[in-house]
Amino acid sequence: MEARAAMAMGWYLHIDMDAFFASVEQVLDPSMRGKPVIVGGRNGRGVVTSASYEARKFGVHSAMPGFQAKKLCPDGIFVPNRRRVYSEFSHKVFAILERYSPEVHAVSIDEGIVDLTGTDRLFGPPLKTADQIIRRIETELGLPSSAGLSQSRVVSKIAATLAKPRGLIYVPPGSEKEFLIPLAVELIPGVGPKTHKLFSRKEIKTIGDLLKRPELAARFLDLGEAQRRERRHDHSIGNETTLDKPLRDKEPMEAVLWDLVEEVGSRLRREELYARCLTLKIRYTNFQTISRSCTLPAPTRFDREIFDVVSDLLRQNIGQGRAVRLLGVSASALQSSGWQEPLFTRERRKSWEKLYQGIDALRHKYGENTIGAATPRNRSR
C-alpha cells in the first residue's frame, strides 16, 4: 500500500548536464577529452561561459574573466562560444527525455525536469528509469549528466546539484526534510546574494534553520508540491549569453539576439506555452545590468514576433558608444491557451502555427541550422 501511495504522489527527475558547453566540445573533438577545456574568454577577452572539470581543478569557473582563467590554467584549451551548436545538442538531450514522459519542462539549455509520475507501467520504478535516462544520454550523445529524483521539484534540483559530476541522488518519500536539514541555504534554487544577506541577518545558515521559520520556508521550499498535480505556468523561459568580445553595433547584437529568440521560441512551443511578457537583459562592459520588459496585447510563441519586440527594446537601450558584453531574452506571464482575440488576428495566428510546426519538424529531423528566417544573422550569407 505504501508503494502505491508513493507512486500516486508524483515523481520528479531533475537532469543537469555536466559542464555542458565544454562537454559538447569534447564530444566534437575527442582529442580534448581529459584536458582542461574553457569555453569563452579567448585571448584574455570576455568571460568564461563553461569549464570542463579538468579546468575546474585549476579554479576556473563560469563567469570568470578570460585573463584570470588564463593565469590559473595557462595550458587550458580555449574555444569560442558556439551557442547554436550547444542548442542543437540541447534539443537532442530533450528528445531523449521526451521518450520517457510527455511532461518534460526545460529549466535552461542544459537542465530539465522530467515528470515520471505513472511511467512505471512502461519503464519500471522511477529510480530504474532515472538511471536508464542518464545512461542513454551518455551512450547516445557522449555527454555526462547528473540527476536528482524525489517527489519535490525543489528537492530534486538540490539533489542534482549535489550529485555532480556523473551522479544520481535519490531522496525516498518521507525523507525530504532529513535530506535537506544539514544543507546550506545557498543550495535552494532562487537564493541569490540578496536573499543570502537576508538569511544571514536572521542567522539562517542551513535549510534546517530555514525550516524553523515556516513563513520563510513556505516561500522557498514547496515540499507539498508532489501532492498537487496541476501544471503550473508561473515560471519563465529564457536564455542569455556572454559575448566573446564586447559589441557596440546594432546588427551583430541583433544576430546574437536572434539566436537567443529562436531558443526561447522553440522551448515555448515544445512546452505548448504562450508568453504575454518579454524581457531583454543587457549587461554593459562596466558591468551595469539593465532589464527592459514589454507586455504584449496578445500572447505569442513565435520567433518573429518575439524578435520584433526585443529588438525594439535593444534599439532603445544601446548607442552613445556603449559596449555590450551580455544579452539575454526571457518570456514570462506564461499560459497554455484560453484567451479571446479578434477574428483577423486569430487567422494570422493559425498561419503562424502551421509555419512554425513545419520549421520545428525540419529542425528536429535535420538539425537546428536546417532552416531559418531572413534575420540579421543570415541575410549576409
Residue ranges and their predicted role:
Residues 180, 187, 193-324:
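DNA-contacting surface of Y-family translesion DNA polymerases
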Residues 112-118, 291-294, 339-345:
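Short, hydrophobic beta-strand segments
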Residues 298-381:
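Acidic, metal-coordinating catalytic segment for phosphate/diphosphate chemistry
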